[in-house]
Swiss-Prot record:
Name under which the protein is recorded: Uncharacterized lipoprotein YqgU
Superkingdom as given in the UniProt entry: Bacteria
Localization, UniProt: Cell membrane
The entry's keywords: Cell membrane, Lipoprotein, Membrane, Palmitate, Signal
Signal peptide: 1-20
Matches recorded under Pfam families: YqgU
UniProt membrane topology term: Lipid-anchor
Organism: Bacillus subtilis (strain 168)
């Protein structure tokens, strides 16, 4: 009986200790998040950087720097100010895509009337490289399998040929689907809009590279894009707005939101946008008087929230943890999405002195 009482007392003490530790652990997480928000961002000199290219991880961005003889790609830690050169070329880096999840980088480099597609790991080691003699080039990179891509060559008349590339096997062959712009939706599938009668909307199709089958999904699609585990379509609506339909693996039916469109070239298109997979939030803009409001749409519920007012609508890119947004045509600013503060990432040398 005494032994049973002692065991009961020890068990009660143990449970109390565990319950006491839980709030402390939660407080530590909250304190860590608050500390993360208060970290100072150490800016880059505009004399050193042409512009930022995107997030490699939550605290590291990539940027390019060039002179008449070379272009270099650097990884830059925004909270420590430390930079590391990853890659150098005699040509010009014209496009940088980053797969933060797989820690891989895809470059397009122009040199001597050729465009090279170069695949790197996060240390800057070359995994694949191929030259194309082309007037213009489009590379659709598979975010699910970063060794797969669809490369489209354009000539001066904008005629094109599209090739499916397996970088791991160093294979390239003519794609059975000859469309210039595709969007990967899984390791083996991609979706695309075929031109419609008015050249502004068209039917949306999906193609399975494993089974070599094509399937029509829906009609009258104005715009389509995809991210990892999320895709969306836009259809025209009245009053300069579009009907957005968001799809995720968790959704049983598309989540719909009406949102303003912008006039782009000869058609309507979405405002600048990006997607935060961690938070399930689609970030975009809407005009508000002479300014623009950055807003977030929850792709699971369709709920929207205005975040911050900005003078211009410019490209944005959300960090993998959803805490920060690169903003600007050269990603020269960072928006802290919790406090809505805007910090300068790239500044003139005079401002640094």
């Amino acid at each position: 009986m005494l032994m049973r009482s002692v065991c009961f007392i020890l068990l009660a003490v143990l449970l109390f200790s565990l319950s006491a530790c839980e709030p402390s652990h939660q407080q530590q997480k909250q304190a860590s998040a608050a500390k993360d928000e208060k970290k100072d961002i150490i800016p880059l000199s505009a004399e050193k950087a042409d512009g930022a290219e995107g997030w490699l991880n939550n605290s590291t961005i990539l940027y390019t720097a060039s002179n008449p003889t070379k272009t270099e790609l650097f990884a830059y830690r925004i909270f420590t100010g430390k930079a590391k050169k990853l890659y150098q070329t005699d040509g010009q880096i014209v496009d940088v895509q980053i797969n933060a999840r797989e820690q891989m980088i895809l470059l397009q480099i122009t040199h001597s009337q050729k465009t090279a597609v170069v695949l790197l790991n996060a240390e800057g080691e070359t995994l694949y490289e191929k030259d194309y003699e082309t007037y213009e080039l489009e590379a659709a990179w598979n975010q699910y399998d970063p060794y797969q891509m669809m490369v489209t060559e354009f000539n001066e008349n904008w005629d094109f040929h599209t090739y499916q590339v397996n970088a791991k096997k160093d294979e390239s062959f003519l794609s059975p689907v000859q469309v210039p712009f595709i969007h990967w939706t899984s390791k083996n599938t991609f979706d695309y809009v075929k031109e419609g009668r008015d050249d502004k909307t068209g039917p949306l199709y999906t193609f399975d590279t494993a089974s070599k089958t094509e399937q029509k999904l829906e009609d009258n699609v104005l715009f389509f894009d995809s991210f990892h585990q999320m895709s969306f379509t836009v259809k025209s609506a009245s009053g300069g707005k579009g009907t957005y339909q968001f799809k995720t693996p968790q959704s049983t039916s598309p989540v719909t939101a009406k949102w303003p469109l912008q006039a782009k070239y000869t058609s309507l298109a979405p405002m600048e946008y990006d997607y935060d997979e961690a938070g399930g939030l689609f970030y975009t803009f809407k005009q508000s008087g002479d300014a623009y409001k950055l807003a977030a749409i929850n792709v699971a519920s369709g709920e929207t929230k205005d975040l911050v007012s900005l003078r211009e609508m410019e490209p944005i890119q959300i960090s993998p943890n959803g805490k920060y947004a690169l903003y600007g045509f050269h990603f020269e600013q960072i928006i802290l999405l919790k406090s809505h503060e805007t910090k300068q990432l790239i500044i003139d040398q005079k401002e640094m002195e």
